[in-house]
Regions:
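C-terminal motif of bacterial Sec signal peptides marking the signal peptidase cleavage site
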Residues: 18-21
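Bacterial N-terminal signal peptides that target proteins for export
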Residues: 1-11
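Short aromatic-glycine-(Arg/Gly/Cys) micro-motifs in beta-strand/loop hairpins
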Residues: 48-53, 101-113
Length: 150
């Protein structure tokens, strides 16, 4: 009778498949078709979109960072259930970056869809250029959440 136990190599293969399939990936936003999870408007502006991924892997998209902060702040999704926060890089429309490490400018020169008026940047140099062109206040993630909280 053949040995019915799997080989160690096949066990490692299936274990690695299981582990990697559970990993969080960067979300994608279907601009012009996706609906903001908070305000239900279509997500159209590639400079201001935002998204979260929960610990269970569910993706929520938002038309600006203010909607994302207010949605979680209102308790609709428990903050403890958010695995990753993302925002669109204002300098590279449609490209999602880590919201917790992004550099922000908040001011009326940045007319975001729901008037949070906050723009995210991947680099300090890009934020500096935006500040010179449009003005506003420099913020980090913690400060931005305080300004835009519900």
């Amino acid at each position: 009778m053949k040995n019915l136990l799997p080989s160690p190599i096949s066990l490692l293969f299936f274990l690695s498949l299981t582990l990697f399939s559970c990993g969080q990936t960067t979300p994608s936003i279907d601009f012009d078709h996706a609906e903001c999870a908070h305000c239900r408007m279509n997500v159209v502006d590639r400079q201001f979109g935002a998204a979260i991924i929960t610990l269970k892997g569910r993706q929520y998209v938002f038309d600006d960072v203010g909607c994302m902060i207010q949605h979680v702040g209102s308790g609709t999704i428990a903050e403890s259930q958010v695995a990753n926060w993302y925002v669109c890089d204002h300098a590279r429309p449609g490209v999602l970056i880590d919201a917790t490490t992004a550099r922000y400018v908040n001011g009326p020169g940045f007319r975001s869809p729901m008037r949070g008026d906050a723009a995210a940047f991947a680099t300090e140099a890009e934020r500096t250029i935006a500040l010179q062109e449009k003005g506003g206040e420099e913020l980090d993630w913690k400060q931005l959440r305080e300004v835009l909280k519900p």
